[in-house]
Amino acid sequence: MAYNDLRDWIAALDRAGELKKIRTQADPILEIAEITDRVSKSRSARYGQGGPALLFQNIKGHPGSQLLINQFGSARRMNLALEVNSLEQVAERIRGFMDVKSPQGFLDKVKMLPMLAEMGKFFPKTVPTGPCKEVVKRDNFSLLDFPILQCWPKDSGRFITLPCVITRDPRTGKRNVGMYRMQVYDERTTGMHWQRQKVAAEHYRDAIRNAATSTAHVGTAALGGPAGQSPAATTAVDIMAKTSGASVPAEGAYPSGKMEVAVAIGTEPALTFSAIVPAPPEVEEFLIAGFLRQSPVELVKCETVDLDVPAHAEIVLEGYVNLDELRSEGPFGDHTGFYSLEDQYPVFHVTCVTHRKDPIYATTIVGTPPMEDGWMGKAVERIFLPLMKLTIPELVDINLPLEGVFHNLVIVSIRKSYPGQARKVMNAIWSLGQAMFTKCILVVDEDVDVHNLGEVTLKVLNNIDPERDIQFTLGPVDSLDHASRLPNYGSKMGIDATRKWASEGFTRPWPDEITMDATTKSLVDAKWKSLAKDLGIE
């Protein structure tokens, strides 16, 4: 049965022995982050088990508040979050839906009815009200009432780090739920870290184009018109609105040059996880969450903006971003293990806060791995492998090592059947959504275990001729890549570590790998139990 809300999830963690309640006073400025970092890198975490989820119940400056962190910080908790014994179960369900063929006749259509009925259960549904409306504050509110963390010494302030940020495509009306950090500037404003390749940033650019062609709120001045235009407005267009191609037709323009935004904090785990998944463009994250939890997400209307939010969220922030306003955001200690640099981003103005009575603030900390976000990334890797195979059918397995921080290294094994196939796979990966940011791709043969980094290292270094097998290309890179020649643009490397064929220009014989013959292995197998005991290596 799906978790109804964050509190159901916390109770499940407690029952499973995966939660530790911390009653010792801890400061949201740096101290809670340091405690969590030590837990994330504890002995159990290093051996792949992950430290426990933490519920802080005595937070300095916030009497009576509770804070949940590291809720996804182990493989077991990711399984618990999605209510499966193994993430392969989710992948198998995805494969099942992908295997559905177009019906060829009446009988085929009848056979599809149960599948269609099941899919219908996942769509979100709007309800009149929900727990997130237990307290409604249209004024007399402050973001600083919540125990928002400053995680690292050189962070530019407190950051909301686990939000579900809800926007709407001004062209199509489709909703998006994304996870973007939010620097708290004061009691009622935050930054919106919408990196330019993200969906919400595209919504923002579309809103600017619409407003520029259909209203006077942005108009020619915002597009570099008369002198006296505010630097913020000019910068907003320069950084966020410049795209190739013609302007979008004026439709669905936002009134007064504003774009409405809502933020849900403390949602049930499937929805929180859905905010980070690389969803196909036509699929809403609310639907993905319904699929993962096997039950629809309940939504309620906001009080001050025309958006729907999760009815069972602990906290909801409603508001808008001005289309001509940017503000300095960062530095921020990021998942790369380095501080992401200060830059200009849109500003979120909060118009209303709703929350549950005694809301539980859910957050996370990112930094040098292993940390909580790494386990979430590994779940994405496992669950979405079947979708990658739709585009790359020769793909056998994939590994995004934690040390590669998701976008620096991808290791794939392939079923090779023609010359140059490894390079084809590299280019296919660089064309797949967020995988376009991958800095380095290693391609190995299907018999290599991509999750065994020792085996991968051995095969890669033995199988390559560097000049022949390393490919360089240029393209988009992650905004957090501090080493690229330019922001958002740099080089990538692909390494073909597959066995080389004569049809690929390799004229020498390829040697056999060293393995013991089956007869000898059987003889030793019969003696091994006794030998191992004598040798003390059972």
Task: Set out the residue ranges of the language-model regions.
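Intrinsic disorder/low-complexity segments
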Residues: 212-256
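Extended, highly charged
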Residues: 1-211, 255-332, 336-538
